[in-house]
Amino acid sequence: MVFTSPSWCQDILMPIPNNELVGEFVMRRGHGLNDVSEDSPSSVCAYTGKSYSIRDIRHNVKSLSKSLSQILGWDFNHGNPEDKVVAVCSLNSIDYVPLTWAIHRLGGICLLLHPTSSASELETLMRKANCKAVFTCKPLMAQCQAAFTAINGDPSNIFLVELPLPEEQPVKISNTTISQLIADGEGLPDLQPLDLQDFDSKERLAYFCPTSGTSGFLKIAKVSHANVMANILQCTTMDSYTTASQTDVTLGILPLSHAYGLLVQHFVTFRGDCIILHPKFDMQIALKSVQQYRIVRLYLVPTIIGALATNPILFKLFDLSSVKRVITGSASLPEQVSKAINQLCPEWEINPGYGLTESFVCMSWTSPNSQYPGSTGCLLPLVEARLLDADGSDITAHGQAGDLLVRSPSVMKEYLDDDLKRDVTFDSDGWLRTGDVATFKQNPKGDSHLFIVDRKKDIMKVKGIQVPPVEIEGHLVAHPAVDDAAVVAISDEDAGERPFAFVVRSQKVMTDIDEKSLKKDISGYIQSTLSEPYWLRQNIRFIDAIPKSHNGKALKFKLKQQLVTSSA
């Protein structure tokens, strides 16, 4: 059985362009969505108040591309795109995405590197992508220089992204800045017009997006211009059923180096929204900007929503009355956290979604038009999904869990230098194997909603019963003394496997209780809310922080390594 989007949202607002760059598509007005002036603020730096309109962005993209063309010797109409790869490794900046669009104007591809990557990871990814230039910021300059030098990169091709952050020990760096490149480009002659006669948006790559599952194995997803434009249109279509004629002020705290954050920046710019962009996440600074700019939409991850839910004092310290919608992705939103935030802010619409870097990005999204508590929403238009049982047969009924496969015009073509065979990632008909176990349920309106059960490789069997760790984790983070938690499977002679919880203690609640007593309290809490296969007993360990990947997912293989090390 093939699951699709609801009957009221079957097609996208307009065709996906087949001969256009994603930046040009986003920047041009006249889509028929919202009547927004080209001089209205499109992106604002939360720290300095500096803003860019679409007119400013278009000017900067043009000037940047001219400067880079002169320095690198590239132009759009000549050369292989995979020989024109530029790495961007920086904290958020209002220049970040326009920079990527300037690189696209030269026929180049942007490799997005996460700021928390180690020097060895940076070197591995730069080498694999055959990087020819790097844009980075002062805090990351040293490791980027080391990585680029290690792959014999030209040091003069390392450029600086300026950030509005104070420096503890100011360091003078002579690298050319984006501001200098824009200024220099203003005096250069225009580049040759883009020859798009043979350009295919489906085939031409826009971004190299590193991605890793809980295995920790780094891969690079090859994302085309059409992939990004498709998901912009899919999200815009779903969103248009409730907000077709209005623009919003939105909060930009998601890393632009991550697919979710990058998509949001493209999506809100296309809609005509104004995004208040933060270089990095700081809860109090973020909430202050919500108050200052009267932000309407928050794009968050579950851990931040959980932190808000467990710190109600924040709602007294800051005026958050402007907020109407909270969109969350990157990981599952525990139902207990959703209920807690709803009690604090019943006027907020909480809209969970589901997606992958490989599907760039969003596959399902909760529309105010169709709700189902605990779900990740309905499939977006043009997204198809299948569920396979243990025998590989298609599940044909609602309410039955199976391995989730998806197909969409936004799904990547393949991984770069694929170490995994394509038939491991995709089936013979082009369906992407997500690695997630999911189910579909119908709400009272008859719309099919997607529920993510857990990662396939994380689900444990206790006495033959499948136990998803995410369900235990959802209850753990609802405990007042728990800030964060991750659950893994351990071997058990009688049950086969049992859950083992790694818990980060709250620094504000029940701090006077010793670890033994708190373990007993948490264990009793789980026993009172879940059935016997989910019980933790004494399988609880307190740690300072849950190790996580760049996109906020728990690295459970590292937690399992801790168990092996401690038992050795």
Swiss-Prot record:
Pneumocandin B0 is the starting molecule for the first semisynthetic echinocandin antifungal drug, caspofungin acetate. Pneumocandin B0 is a minor fermentation product, and its industrial production was achieved by a combination of extensive mutation and medium optimization. Inactivation of three of gloP/GLP450-1, gloO/GLP450-2, and gloM/GLOXY1 generates 13 different pneumocandin analogs that lack one, two, three, or four hydroxyl groups on 4R,5R-dihydroxy-ornithine and 3S,4S-dihydroxy-homotyrosine of the parent hexapeptide. Keywords: ATP-binding, Ligase, Nucleotide-binding. Residues 282-352 are annotated as: SBD1. Disruption phenotype: Fails to produce pneumocandins or any new compound that might correspond to a deacylated peptide core or free dimethylmyristic acid. One of its GO terms (molecular function) is CoA-ligase activity. PROSITE patterns: AMP_BINDING. Pfam families: AMP-binding (PF00501), AMP-binding_C (PF13193). Residues 353-415 are annotated as: SBD2. ATP binds at residues 211-219, 352-357, 436, 455, 553. PANTHER family: BCDNA.GH02901, LONG-CHAIN-FATTY-ACID--COA LIGASE. This is Acyl-CoA ligase gloD. It comes from Glarea lozoyensis (strain ATCC 20868 / MF5171).
